[in-house]
Each structure stands twice: as structure tokens, then as C-alpha cells.
Design a protein with these regions (language model features):
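Conserved class I S-adenosyl-L-methionine
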Residues: 2-63, 123, 160-181
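A generic alpha-to-beta junction signature in SAM-dependent methyltransferases
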Residues: 62-63, 86, 153
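Class I SAM-dependent methyltransferase SAM/SAH-binding core
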Residues: 70-72, 76-126
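A short SAM/SAH-binding and catalytic strip from SAM-dependent methyltransferases
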Residues: 135-147
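A short glycine-rich, Lys/Arg-flanked "PGG" loop and its adjoining helix->strand segment in the class I
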Residues: 146-158
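Core SAM-dependent methyltransferase catalytic element
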Residues: 194-209
């Protein structure tokens, strides 16, 4: 078994454990930051041409156009840049646990997007944002922390989960599990998308309780 295979198995194990028991994240947080810091300099070279396809397909279903967007697990910022290009009036925050990933994201940010996109270090299990701050929260290949997502999304706002390799993505949560967790937290109007090798799920938070 090579290191890549071991890494994928560990990612899947971590995802399954944390989705079921979010408090376990504290056991994985430090090593996760270390892993992504280590690969940050070469992360962009590892991306495949269709990496953003599921995300971009699902973004077409977001209505109305959001004004404030949070991209969790932004990494080197490719998704945040795509979101800013899709919604030219939106302010986009790309948040990530890895300082080195964020450094790469800042270096890759085009000047024409610099006034609308910023990158911040944040732990998705304890986000430093007020309740209802964002109209859209996106995740790509990211362990979801459902309570925090539900807290920071505004009423009537949307959440988007994209997995670039579908069920083969190391960090993956099946659509039926996403629906179950989101319904419990007041989300509705689910829509599924398939593009490239992956899939995405979009849902809207109820405007009223």
C-alpha cells in the first residue's frame, strides 16, 4: 500500500468519524493542518481540469445571486475565484485551516478580484463569523460541520457541497446523508448536480422558522 492510498483511507476514516461525532475533530485538526501545509506548494499542479466542474454546475442553481459568500476549505483559492467570477457583485471570503494554503491562495489572486475576495485562517468547526453573515456557504471536498454552517448562513440563503471525484473523493459525504443532516437544521429545496467526475448538492435555508 503506497502513501497516496494510505492518505485516501485516512481521509475517508476522518470524514466518517467527524461527521458522526464532530467532537472528534479536535483529535484530527493538528495533523490535518500539517498535511495540507505540506502539500500547499504543489497543490495547484495536482488539480485536474474538471476539478471545479461540480461546483460550477451547482453555482448555476443559486438564486438570487448572493452578495456575501463563504468558501470553506478554500485551499489555494480556486473555488473562491470561480465564485467571484460567477457572481460579480459578491464579496467572497475563502477560509481554510492551513496557513500555507492561504499563502498560495493570496499569491494566485488576480488583481481584478482583489477588492472582492479575501482569505482568512479559520477552523470550520468554530467559525469566527456572526450568525446569518453569508448568503451562500460553499464546500469542496470538505468535512462538513453542519451546526456551524447552519448558524452562519442567512435565512433564505444557500449551502453547496461539491465533491470533485464523486464517491471516489477521499473526503466524501453521500447526498442522502447531507440531506438528512441539513433537513434537521431547517434546510429545504434540495438540488443535485453531476459534472465532470463529481457531484454536488445545493440546499436553501428556510426563510422563516
Amino acid at each position: 500500500m503506497n502513501l497516496a492510498t494510505i492518505g485516501r483511507k485516512l481521509a475517508r476514516l476522518t470524514t466518517n468519524a467527524v461527521v458522526s461525532r464532530p467532537w472528534l475533530w479536535r483529535l484530527f485538526r493538528r495533523v490535518t493542518r500539517w498535511q495540507f501545509d505540506a502539500v500547499a506548494p504543489r497543490w495547484e499542479t495536482m488539480r485536474l481540469p474538471d476539478t471545479l466542474a461540480p461546483l460550477e454546475a451547482a453555482l448555476q442553481g443559486v438564486e438570487p445571486a448572493p452578495r456575501r459568500v463563504l468558501d470553506l476549505g478554500t485551499g489555494t483559492g480556486a473555488a473562491a475565484r470561480a465564485i467571484a467570477e460567477r457572481f460579480p457583485e459578491a464579496e467572497v471570503v475563502g477560509a481554510d485551516l492551513s496557513p500555507r494554503m492561504l499563502g498560495e491562495a493570496r499569491r494566485a489572486l488576480p488583481q481584478e478580484l482583489a477588492s472582492r475576495v479575501r482569505y482568512e485562517e479559520a477552523d470550520a468547526s468554530a467559525l469566527p463569523y456572526e450568525d446569518g453573515t453569508f448568503d451562500l456557504v460553499t464546500h469542496q471536498n470538505m468535512i462538513p460541520f453542519f451546526d456551524e454552517v447552519a448558524r452562519v448562513v442567512a435565512r433564505g440563503g444557500s449551502v453547496l457541497f461539491a465533491f470533485t471525484g464523486g464517491a471516489g473523493t477521499p473526503i466524501y459525504v453521500p447526498p442522502e446523508r447531507l440531506r438528512e443532516e441539513l433537513k434537521r437544521r431547517g434546510f429545504m429545496d434540495f438540488a443535485e448536480f453531476r459534472a465532470g467526475r463529481g457531484n454536488a448538492l445545493l440546499a436553501r435555508k428556510a426563510a422563516r422558522v
